[in-house]
Amino acid sequence: MPLHFKQLGHGEPLVLLHGLFGSGDNWFGVAPKLAEKFHVLIPDLRNHGHSPHHAEMDYPLMAADVEKFFSAQKIESAHVIGHSMGGKVAMQFALDFPARVKKLVVVDMAPRAYAPAHDKIFAALLALDLKLFQTRAEIEAALASEISSLNLRRFLLKNLSRDAHGKFVWKMNLRGVAENYSRLGEVLNAGNPFAEPTLFIRGGRSDYINAADEVAIHHQFPAA
């Protein structure tokens, strides 16, 4: 699958992978700084942003998408940073295509299964009949009863776009992602350990990585 992407800077290639409900644009708070030393490439993963929609979605498929992206951009190997869902894609990519990854950084994600935590968000978004709304503010207000966080609502609504008739549509394949959501919580398909330097970063208030995860981390990523 050909992935939409943006790029900036010069130097060694650095590929940034975004999280669930996100897009490559989420990285532009830090990308310009990274671009002072690296050639930064920021793809939208399948079913997100401006990349193609597909009925199937899991980590081996997304890792294969990234490998094809490397080939299309003539990248032999690169540093890879992934956040959240993108962190799992980055880990799967490193395990499946180790020669493609020089160094790996995983932000707020461990190589284990996670219980569903976004069902309420999917239900709230899928319940919206977008053709009934004229403004983003109206949509945000309609979500407020189900999604209390203003910052989260605004993040989710970055997925809105308008079609040729000026009507709101989702850029991401919302229903497709929802139908594959259980697969996104699954444990990685582990082959041989990834032996290159790896860094795991945990948010100070996050429980996505905990002390119990260190065994699995060091088993699959011994240089972490």
Name the predicted role of every residue range.
Residues 164-221:
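Conserved serine/cysteine hydrolase catalytic core
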Residues 1-15, 35-38, 75-76, 221-223:
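Alpha/beta-hydrolase fold catalytic core
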Residues 116, 131-188:
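Conserved alpha/beta-hydrolase catalytic His-Asp/Glu region
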